């Protein structure tokens, strides 16, 4: 596959993730959009790593670290969302003002 096609795919995924993150009112949807952004970054890391120097695995190893960080972020984010849902009975971002009791 050509470099431009993969970069356009990564840009589309990143744009969809940013749009969803900006317009989302639901915390779970915002977490999903954040994961989409991280996956777009991984696609670009692996693509540039293969394009510039295919003998070294720097981009591939960095993308594995990003996947591990994304998994930890998703676990912590879902734990926070479930805790907020237990206390507030809502996962909407604008209804969960944590400063008020």
Swiss-Prot record:
User: What PANTHER family does UniProt report for this protein, alphabetically?
Assistant: NADH-UBIQUINONE OXIDOREDUCTASE CHAIN 4L (PTHR11434:SF16), NADH-UBIQUINONE OXIDOREDUCTASE SUBUNIT ND4L (PTHR11434)
- Pfam families named among the record's database cross-references: Oxidored_q2
UniProt record, GO biological process:
ATP synthesis coupled electron transport; photosynthesis, light reaction
Q: What is this protein called?
A: NAD(P)H-quinone oxidoreductase subunit 4L, chloroplastic
Q: Summarize the subunit comment.
A: NDH is composed of at least 16 different subunits, 5 of which are encoded in the nucleus.
Task: Please give the family membership noted in the entry.
Answer: Belongs to the complex I subunit 4L family.
Which cell locations does it reside in?
Plastid, Chloroplast thylakoid membrane
The job of this chain, per UniProt, is described as: NDH shuttles electrons from NAD(P)H:plastoquinone, via FMN and iron-sulfur (Fe-S) centers, to quinones in the photosynthetic chain and possibly in a chloroplast respiratory chain. The immediate electron acceptor for the enzyme in this species is believed to be plastoquinone. Couples the redox reaction to proton translocation, and thus conserves the redox energy in a proton gradient.
Give the molecular function GO annotations: oxidoreductase activity, acting on NAD(P)H, quinone or similar compound as acceptor; quinone binding
Its EC top class is translocase
Give the membrane topology: Multi-pass membrane protein
Question: Membrane-spanning residues where?
Answer: 2-22, 32-52, 61-81
């Amino acid at each position: 596959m050509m470099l431009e096609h993969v970069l356009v795919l990564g840009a589309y995924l990143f744009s969809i993730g940013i749009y969803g993150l900006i317009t989302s009112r639901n915390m779970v949807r915002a977490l999903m959009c954040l994961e989409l952004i991280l996956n777009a970054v991984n696609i670009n890391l692996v693509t540039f790593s293969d394009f510039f120097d295919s003998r070294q695995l720097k981009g591939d190893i960095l993308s594995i670290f990003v996947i591990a960080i994304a998994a930890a972020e998703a676990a912590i984010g879902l734990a926070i969302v479930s805790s907020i849902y237990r206390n507030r009975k809502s996962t909407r971002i604008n209804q969960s003002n944590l400063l008020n009791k």
